[in-house]
Structures are given as C-alpha cells and as structure tokens.
C-alpha cells in the first residue's frame, strides 16, 4: 500500500497520544501550545494537532474523545466560580446550576462544531482533509464519564444533522469517522447510557456512521483491553511498556501489505495442494515488503516530524534523536 510514499521516512497510521499532548502541552510550527483551560480551547487545539499530524504522515489517525472530558469539567467549574462571584447568595442553587448548565451546553455545542467544521475545511500539505477517526467510548470507570457522555451525545447529534454544502443543503461529511463502543451500560438492555446508543443508531440510519465495536469482544480478543483502530480499520497488537502497563496511544503502524486471497484461490484452481504453497509464498513476500518498510524507517531522526517524535503525538524524543528504539 501507498508505495508512492515509500521513500519518505514516515509511517502509515497511528493512535495519537492526545491525552498527553493536551495535558502537558505541545509545539506546533515552533509555537508552544500550553494545556487548555476550557473545553472550547481544547477542541481547537485538538483540531490543530490533527491537521499537523495528518500533514506529516500518509495514513489515518485516531483520537479518543474521553480526553476532552476533563476540559468540559474545567469549563463547568469556571462558570460556577464566575456566577458565584457575580451573584453570590442572590441566586438560589437551582437557578445557579441552570445558568451554569445553559452556558456549558453552549460551549459544548460550539466546541464539537469546531471539531467537525475544522476537520472538514482544513487542508493538509497532502492536499486533502485529515483522515481521522473519533473513538467514542463511554467508560464507567472514567472519573469524567458524565462529561464524556455529554460530548459523545453532542457529536452524534451534530453528525445526524450533517453539514451544509455550497447550496445550503445538509449532507453527510466524510470525516471524522466515528466509532462507538457498545458495553454493558449502553447495549439497549436497560443501561444508564442506552439513550446515547439510541441516538447512535438513529445517526447511523441517516449518516452511515458511527461504526460499532463490542467492548466485550475486544476484551476477549485483546487481553481485556478496549481501544480504537488506527484511522479506518487497522488494530494494534497488545504491547506493554517497561512498567508492565498496556500502551495503545502513541503507537503506530510502520506499513501495510495486503494479500489477495481470492486471487490465490483462482490461481490454485480450487486445489488445496496448490493453494497452501501459494499462500506461503505470498506470506513470505508480505514479510519481505514489511521489513523493507521497517528498514527504511531505521535511522530516521526526530527532526523529520517534530509533532510526531518530539512533541507528543507518538513520543517526546530529543532533537536529532533517532527513532529506532520506537521501531523494535
């Protein structure tokens, strides 16, 4: 795949370590981007990161929306402080909460709209919109689960509505792709978040997305872990860091090679004795092609793509540091 990019020292697709980049800051075009103080700013920074990453790689990328939850709470806390400072005891708690909720929803709607419109209007250096997937996983163990649920619901609501084309007609945007995770609490069996799944189904019926992933099946197949594919459909294999912790975000796919199984079946003439040797031959070619990709990346310096290697999308290597330790 993507043989025209073979000579460029960059990989195919990845899971951006967006949580680290938002929490600890990043650098884009030589300018320091500090950790956001509000949801709206976090959404803007996230789209800037997506565009920068897409301009420096040829494959898709995925971001986990759960990392925006804490910033929605920051906004709630900010509005609560502001209203308390302004009105104090003049307003009863119920009215105060109503004020905060109204203002928070305005920011939630605006932030999600920023993500959707920025991704669909920004052009990368490749001359195309960023190929990006938003991973919508409502994890009950997340301390910001209520905020994440609000964000996911609004993303689905806006995707259902669509984006206006030049004639002013609402159409289905190509990106971002949406992946919605089904778990025990939202699988339409009386769970707390079933209402969001109903919105997802309604959205899929009109806009084709979201796609769905079963958390139960993923845990069975991936050692109890639930995570997004990279861009469109490539899943990482489980891997633990030096501390024994599973790592998904901040990892990538060095290259992609496909096998045309129907072609092998046709060539073998439905003869199993011919089919298996042919398959072994093709698998050997696949391995050779993948190792060519691997060796082409060896020796690459972090300066080739600072947003990936130096400023958090994949790692935080030093300037001019080889990326080799991330390849093995």
Residue ranges and their predicted role:
Residues 1-327:
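Conserved catalytic cores of very large enzyme subunits
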């Amino acid at each position: 795949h993507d043989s025209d990019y073979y000579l460029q020292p960059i990989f195919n697709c990845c899971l951006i370590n967006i949580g680290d980049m938002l929490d600890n800051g990043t650098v884009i075009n030589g300018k320091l981007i500090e950790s956001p103080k509000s949801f709206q700013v976090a959404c803007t920074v996230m789209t800037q990161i997506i565009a920068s990453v897409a301009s420096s790689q040829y494959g898709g990328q995925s971001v986990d929306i759960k990392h925006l939850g804490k910033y929605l709470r920051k906004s709630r806390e900010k509005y609560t402080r502001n209203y308390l400072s302004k009105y104090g005891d003049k307003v009863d708690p119920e009215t105060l909460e109503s004020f905060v909720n109204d203002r928070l929803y305005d920011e939630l709607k605006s932030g999600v709209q920023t993500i959707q419109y920025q991704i669909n209007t920004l052009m990368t250096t490749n001359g195309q919109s960023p190929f990006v997937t938003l991973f919508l996983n409502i994890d009950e163990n997340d301390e910001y689960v209520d905020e994440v649920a609000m964000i996911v619901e609004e993303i689905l609501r806006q995707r259902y509505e669509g984006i206006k084309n030049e004639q002013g007609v609402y159409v289905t945007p190509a990106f971002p792709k949406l992946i919605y995770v089904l778990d025990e609490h939202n699988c339409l069996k009386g769970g707390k978040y079933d209402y969001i799944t109903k919105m997802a189904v309604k959205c899929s019926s009109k806009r084709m997305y979201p796609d769905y992933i079963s958390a139960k099946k993923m845990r069975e197949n991936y050692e109890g872990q639930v995570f997004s594919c990279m861009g469109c459909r490539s899943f990482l294999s489980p891997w633990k860091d030096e501390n024994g912790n599973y790592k998904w975000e901040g990892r990538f796919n060095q290259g992609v090679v496909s096998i045309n199984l129907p072609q092998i079946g046709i060539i073998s003439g439905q003869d199993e004795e011919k089919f298996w040797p042919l398959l072994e031959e093709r698998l050997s070619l696949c391995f050779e092609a993948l190792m060519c990709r691997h060796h082409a990346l060896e020796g690459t310096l972090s300066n080739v793509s600072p947003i990936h290697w130096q400023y958090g999308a994949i790692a935080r290597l030093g300037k001019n540091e080889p990326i080799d330790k991330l390849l093995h």
